[in-house]
């Protein structure tokens, strides 16, 4: 351990020495940089090195001295001397050049004298331990006049003075010869004459002004340049100046876009959907494409197809607007609960806990399996290698009971008595046995296994699987893992192996908010054939102006409104006199204008947004923000508002309301229109007015309550008119219910009978019309020269005797209903009913009923005729069939007419039976009971019977 400590201390010492050496090198470099001017001017190196040694001693870190920046000199770069040779003029003559050179030679010795005098006046700067020298630096401008150059050249050097600030830093104040002056002293020196300037300076009193000679002013001839190049340079300089000023002064951000040359740099103007629909309907592109004389491209056809799609979409939008299904509000963005940072629901918390419990149970199960595997492996090693694989432990001392008694006797002080009782032989035997056990344990614990020697298991039992264990396979399960127990290859793999952490909250937030970067900043297509152009665009976040939304270019030309002003529903005019004016602050007006620009005169939405800022507090009348009040305030704010700009179904009502409000405002002194106030007009805004309105409403309510009529306590109260009626018994209740059911049944029967009479009357009218048509057709058939159909066609034997149909119906009814004469119709009515039914069936199912209806519409009705026989009806049917289908033979036509007649008669008989049976059921009903008190004769119906009656009524109706 001592060797390791020595090695560590030596390593630390070498590191510290290297750090200190590097620090000293840096300080030395800083020192030489501060004395760079002296080295260039050829100063004394020995003195500079001594100062360097002192500087390093002052900033020695081993002596706990930190670096002090004031110990360094401030470095002042020396400007290179300008060329004093004046520019030669192109038009100068050799004579002038000679005079100029001669004057310069005469002036040089005088200048040297003045410099010497100036150097004598320089006072060296004294510091605490060292001196700082400052050499003068001469500046000369080419092309300066003598008046400007002379005072600058003869300015005396000022003495730099160092002052120690409160923070301990030395600040150098002063100036050196050659430093540039500000513009103000130069301008003052120009205005004053040279002699006054020189006399005011104290350094010029030692010099003779007459010795100073003026140098000639160099003359520069203007060079000829091309005017085209000058204009290009001027425009470029102006553009750069404007761009710089625009980027810096305006403070606006700009974006540089790289795009194709064919792509338009400006966005296309937005056209309203109504204008697109109007243009597509009046002048569609699909009609203009075929007559074109130039070449047609795919883009033209795509444009025409897009126009059709726009038309379909706009019509669908208009349909949804009419149905109030087109919302102007954007639905709220769906937040995925999985991506939220915290589970907001109970189910989310339960899932999170279940996820951790699953991981905990799974890992704990694996840990138990690994512990069991390790324990089983340890047991196998113990039985295989013996106690050599066990850890070192203290040996177990097996003591008998007598020894324990000896120990107890020692503690109690009775050892002498116990030793006398135990014999010396037993005690000696016990001690020898204990020594043997201790020797055996020590031998087992001290036995070690050499790493080179092989360990053989005792031959207790042989296992054939022991040969596989010779390969020395690693254990499957491990309860721990160390980094040193891994191979180098596995270490490199583990360094790059990603650790599964699940979906973190930060990653979910990053996935949700994807940053938007213009594609032109990161991607440039190299295999593109087009030229690229660079465009600079300003990012303007200004809100649209108030006037910009109210006016726009027309649908085709001129100025029209971009959104027609559709006012909301106006309130009733009868409440106009009692109207309270609303108060609008500047903040409310600003919010109103912003919402109008954003939602384009959707007054319901604007009113909801403006009134939502009030919250759930009390809202007085002066603070209400209904859609109409927002519209009224908008009319006041917009100076260019005109009544004719309003469109829509509510425009007339709004115009009338505004006219009446203006008229009423002129008649009375009280204000009813909205009032705009500022923070300076009413203290604390309009809160005072709000509370005043509250107290006014309370005062009115109290006054109304006081004026309300009160009950007179002296008047006795009228007793309640309660009719004393006896409670009916169950028998009476059942009787009343039976009477009610009977009346309802009678009313139903009467309704059905009335319907049947109306139906029979209609059938009778139709039968008369059919008979008239048949009578009209009979003389036409006789006037024809052809022989009658009875001579051509043999008579067909009918299945029943030839008698009128009415008589047959009467006989059938008499057979079916013998003895019924109360409610059954008479024989005359029955015959009429049968005729009506037969006529109706003939009209509905005969093949020529269309021609008969046409004939009846033209011929006026005649008097009553004889009823037709069965033979005549069959022959008339046969003639109609032959007229419609000439291909049929007379025999076939007679057979078809006879079968058709039989079917019609069967249907008429069934209908007649149904008609006769209904009055019969009404007649057989017994008379209802009287309203007397004969309760014993009436049986109360059971609930089941009542339900059956209700169902029967539903079926009948």
From Swiss-Prot:
Compositional bias of kind Polar residues: 89-100, 184-196
Any Pfam family the entry gives: Myb_DNA-bind_6
Annotated Gene3D superfamilies: Homeodomain-like
Record's keyword annotation contains S-adenosyl-L-methionine: no
Positions of the HSA domain: 334-409
Record GO cellular component, one term: nucleus
Entry keyword annotation includes Nucleotidyltransferase: no
Swiss-Prot/TrEMBL GO biological process terms: chromatin organization; DNA repair; protein-containing complex assembly
Cited InterPro entries: Homeodomain-like_sf, HSA_dom, SANT/Myb
Ranges of residues in domain Myb-like: 576-638
Alphabetic keyword roster: Activator, Chromatin regulator, DNA damage, DNA repair, Nucleus, Transcription, Transcription regulation
GO molecular function: chromatin binding
Extent of Low complexity compositional bias: 762-792
Biased composition (Basic and acidic residues): 102-115, 734-750
CDD domains: SANT
Region (Disordered): 72-115, 160-196, 703-804, 922-957
Protein localization: Nucleus
Chief location: nucleus
Record note on quaternary structure: Component of the NuA4 histone acetyltransferase complex.
Record family assignment: Belongs to the EAF1 family.
Purpose: Component of the NuA4 histone acetyltransferase complex which is involved in transcriptional activation of selected genes principally by acetylation of nucleosomal histone H4 and H2A. The NuA4 complex is also involved in DNA repair.
Protein name per the record: Chromatin modification-related protein EAF1
Species in which this protein is naturally found: Eremothecium gossypii (strain ATCC 10895 / CBS 109.51 / FGSC 9923 / NRRL Y-1056)
């Amino acid at each position: 351990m001592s060797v390791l400590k020595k090695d560590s201390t030596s390593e630390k010492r070498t590191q510290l020495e290297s750090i200190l050496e590097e620090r000293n090198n840096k300080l030395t470099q800083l020192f030489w940089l501060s004395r760079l001017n002296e080295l260039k001017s050829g100063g004394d190196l020995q003195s500079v090195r001594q100062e360097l040694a002192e500087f390093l001693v002052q900033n020695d870190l081993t002596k706990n001295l930190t670096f002090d920046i004031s110990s360094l000199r401030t470095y002042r770069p020396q400007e290179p001397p300008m060329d004093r040779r004046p520019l030669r003029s192109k038009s100068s003559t050799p004579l002038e050049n000679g005079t100029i050179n001669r004057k310069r030679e005469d002036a040089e010795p005088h200048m040297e004298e003045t410099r010497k005098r100036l150097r004598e006046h320089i006072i060296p700067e004294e510091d605490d331990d060292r001196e700082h020298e400052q050499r003068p630096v001469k500046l000369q401008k080419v092309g300066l006049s003598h008046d400007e150059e002379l005072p600058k050249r003869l300015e005396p050097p000022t003495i730099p003075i160092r002052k120690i600030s409160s923070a301990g830093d030395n600040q150098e104040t002063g100036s050196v010869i050659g430093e540039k002056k500000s513009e103000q002293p130069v301008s003052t020196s120009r205005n004053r004459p040279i002699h006054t300037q020189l006399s005011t300076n104290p350094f010029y009193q030692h010099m003779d002004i007459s010795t100073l000679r003026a140098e000639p002013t160099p003359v520069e001839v203007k060079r000829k340049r091309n005017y085209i190049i000058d204009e290009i340079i001027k425009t470029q300089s102006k553009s750069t100046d404007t761009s710089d000023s625009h980027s810096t002064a305006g403070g606006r951000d700009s974006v540089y876009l790289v795009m194709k040359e064919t792509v338009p740099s400006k966005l296309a103007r937005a056209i309203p959907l109504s204008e697109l629909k109007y243009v597509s309907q009046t002048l569609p592109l699909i009609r203009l494409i075929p007559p074109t004389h130039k070449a047609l491209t795919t883009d033209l056809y795509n444009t025409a197809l897009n126009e059709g799609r726009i038309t379909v979409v706009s019509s669908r939008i208009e349909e949804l607007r009419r149905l109030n299904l087109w919302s102007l509000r954007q639905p709220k963005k769906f937040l995925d609960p999985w991506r939220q940072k915290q589970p907001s629901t109970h189910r989310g918390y339960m899932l999170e806990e279940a996820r951790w419990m699953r991981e905990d149970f799974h890992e704990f199960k694996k840990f138990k399996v690994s512990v069991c595997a390790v324990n089983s492996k340890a047991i196998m090693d113990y039985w295989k290698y013996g106690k050599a694989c066990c850890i070192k432990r203290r040996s177990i001392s097996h003591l008998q009971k007598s020894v324990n008694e000896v120990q107890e006797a020692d503690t109690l002080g009775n050892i002498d008595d116990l030793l006398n009782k135990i014999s010396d032989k037993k005690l000696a035997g016990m001690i020898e046995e204990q020594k043997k056990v201790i020797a055996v344990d020590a031998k087992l614990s001290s036995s070690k296994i050499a790493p080179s020697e092989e360990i053989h298991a005792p031959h207790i039992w042989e296992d054939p699987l022991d040969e596989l264990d010779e390969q020395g396979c690693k254990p499957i399960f491990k309860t721990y893992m160390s980094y040193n127990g891994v191979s180098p290859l596995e270490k490199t793999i583990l360094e790059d192996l990603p650790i599964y952490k699940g979906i973190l909250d930060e990653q979910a937030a990053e996935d949700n908010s994807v940053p938007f970067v213009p594609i032109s900043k990161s991607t440039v297509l190299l295999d593109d054939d087009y030229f690229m152009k660079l465009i600079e665009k300003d990012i303007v976040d200004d809100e649209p102006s108030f006037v910009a939304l109210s006016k726009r270019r027309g649908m085709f030309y001129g100025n029209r409104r971009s959104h027609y002003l559709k006012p909301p529903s106006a309130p009733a005019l009868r409440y106009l006199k009692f109207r309270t004016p609303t108060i609008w602050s500047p903040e409310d007006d600003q919010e109103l204008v912003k919402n109008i620009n954003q939602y384009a005169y959707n007054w319901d939405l604007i009113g909801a947004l403006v009134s939502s800022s009030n919250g759930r507090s009390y809202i007085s009348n002066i603070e209400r923000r209904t859609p109409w009040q927002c519209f009224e305030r908008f009319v006041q704010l917009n100076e260019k508002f005109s009544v004719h700009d309003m469109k829509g179904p509510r425009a007339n009502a709004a115009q009338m309301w505004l006219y009446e409000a203006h008229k009423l405002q002129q008649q009375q002194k009280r204000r009813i229109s909205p009032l705009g106030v500022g923070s300076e007009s009413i203290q604390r805004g309009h809160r005072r007015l709000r509370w005043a309105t509250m107290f006014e409403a309370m005062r009115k309510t109290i006054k109304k309550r006081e004026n309300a009529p009160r009950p007179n306590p002296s008047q006795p109260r009228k007793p309640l008119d309660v009719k004393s009626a006896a409670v009916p018994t169950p028998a009476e209740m059942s009787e009343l219910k039976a009477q009610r059911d009977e009346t309802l049944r009678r009313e139903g029967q009467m309704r059905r009978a009335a319907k049947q009479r109306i139906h029979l009357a209609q059938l009778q009218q139709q039968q008369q019309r059919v008979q008239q048509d048949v009578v009209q057709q009979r003389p036409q058939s006789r006037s024809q020269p052809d022989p009658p159909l009875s001579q051509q066609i043999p008579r067909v034997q009918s299945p029943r005797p030839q008698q009128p149909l009415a008589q047959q119906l009467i006989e059938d009814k008499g057979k079916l209903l013998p003895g019924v004469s109360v409610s059954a119709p008479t024989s005359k009515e029955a015959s009429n009913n049968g005729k009506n039914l037969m006529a109706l069936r003939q009209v509905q199912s005969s093949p020529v009923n269309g021609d008969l209806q046409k004939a009846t519409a033209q011929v006026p009705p005649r008097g009553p005729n004889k009823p037709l026989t069965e033979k005549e009806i069959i022959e008339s049917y046969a003639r109609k069939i032959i007229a419609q289908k000439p291909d049929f033979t007379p025999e076939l036509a007679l057979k078809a007419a006879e079968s058709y007649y039989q079917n019609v008669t069967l249907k008429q008989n069934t209908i007649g039976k149904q008609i006769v049976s209904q009055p019969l059921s009404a007649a057989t009903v017994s008379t209802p009971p009287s309203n007397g008190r004969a309760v014993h004769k009436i049986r109360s119906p059971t609930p089941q019977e009542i339900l059956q009656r209700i169902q029967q009524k539903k079926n009948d109706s």
